[in-house]
From Swiss-Prot:
Region (Disordered): 1-44
Protein name (Swiss-Prot/TrEMBL): Large ribosomal subunit protein bL34
Alphabetic keyword roster: Ribonucleoprotein, Ribosomal protein
GO BP terms, alphabetized: translation
HAMAP family listed in its UniProt record: Ribosomal_bL34
Species assigned in the record: Rickettsia conorii (strain ATCC VR-613 / Malish 7)
An example molecular function term from Gene Ontology annotations: structural constituent of ribosome
Family named by the database record: Belongs to the bacterial ribosomal protein bL34 family.
Length: 44
């Protein structure tokens, strides 16, 4: 059986990267929450 996690840096950046987060209102809300919490790393 094939494993579910097949790592790819390109897909990782496209799906969870900073620019993709900024592209939607919900994504911006996520970044805002993470800034408020004081996360060192905001996105992938």
């Amino acid at each position: 059986m094939k494993r579910t996690f097949q790592p790819s840096n390109l897909v990782r950046k496209r799906r969870h990267g900073f620019r993709s987060r900024m592209a939607t209102p919900t994504g911006r809300a996520i970044l805002k929450k993470r800034r408020t919490k004081g996360r060192h790393k905001l996105s992938a």
